[in-house]
């Protein structure tokens, strides 16, 4: 009887947490290749999770376009829960840059009334309207989400807060605070109401 020999594991498989450790330390340049190794060589479930982690590291590194492509690929290859996760993450990663129509197309598989991801997709679409300045539409959608008894309590509270915020005018400047005076020779400061870093 031949002796059983263990085949060597690929580098990424020996330390599958390396990518996560690097990402958590902020070293996205080294985290992405580590996730890619696991995604390439690990069994399917681990590979898909590594791809989602790789895309998350790309988002944090400011490489949203690349991340969205990975999220879309994961969604295209999965019909279960990972598909929903991937599409929601793709939606949030692109909500500020993608036209509303394209965002609707991206999230369409999740908006069916029987889909458990429908509330998360609705929140992204409402935020898209808010971000693009369609405040009345955003307020209406956030209120509908807040009133939806099937949504989670956390999501309903968050949607209710956004609906109330938008109903009261959001970040509109009512003139109660004078606009900042730009410094001599320097760039103008942001308008009143703009969040500061």
Model-predicted segments: where are they?
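Short, well-ordered turn and helix-capping elements at secondary-structure junctions
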Residues: 20-23, 114, 191-194
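Low-complexity, polar/amphipathic intrinsically disordered segments that mediate membrane, lipid-surface
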Residues: 187-188
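Short extracytoplasmic
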Residues: 11-52
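Soluble extracytoplasmic domains of inner/organellar membrane proteins
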Residues: 42-51, 56-184, 195-197
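Single-pass alpha-helical transmembrane signal-anchor segments
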Residues: 1-6
């Amino acid at each position: 009887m031949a002796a059983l020999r263990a085949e060597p594991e690929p580098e990424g498989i020996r330390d599958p947490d390396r990518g996560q450790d690097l990402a958590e330390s902020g070293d996205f340049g080294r985290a992405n290749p580590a996730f890619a190794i696991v995604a390439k060589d690990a069994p399917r479930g681990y590979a898909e999770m590594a791809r989602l982690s790789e895309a998350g590291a790309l988002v944090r590194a400011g490489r949203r376009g690349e991340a969205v492509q990975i999220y879309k690929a994961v969604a295209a290859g999965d019909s279960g829960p990972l598909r929903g996760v991937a599409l929601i993450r793709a939606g949030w990663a692109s909500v500020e840059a993608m036209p509303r129509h394209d965002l609707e197309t991206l999230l369409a598989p999740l908006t069916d009334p029987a889909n458990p991801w429908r509330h998360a997709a609705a929140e992204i679409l409402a935020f898209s309207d808010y971000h693009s300045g369609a405040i009345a539409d955003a307020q209406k959608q956030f209120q509908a989400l807040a009133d939806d008894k099937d949504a989670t309590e956390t999501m309903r509270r968050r949607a209710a807060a956004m609906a109330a915020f938008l109903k009261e005018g959001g970040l509109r400047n009512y003139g109660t605070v004078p606009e900042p005076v730009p410094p001599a020779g320097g760039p103008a400061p942001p308008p009143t109401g703009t969040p500061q870093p």
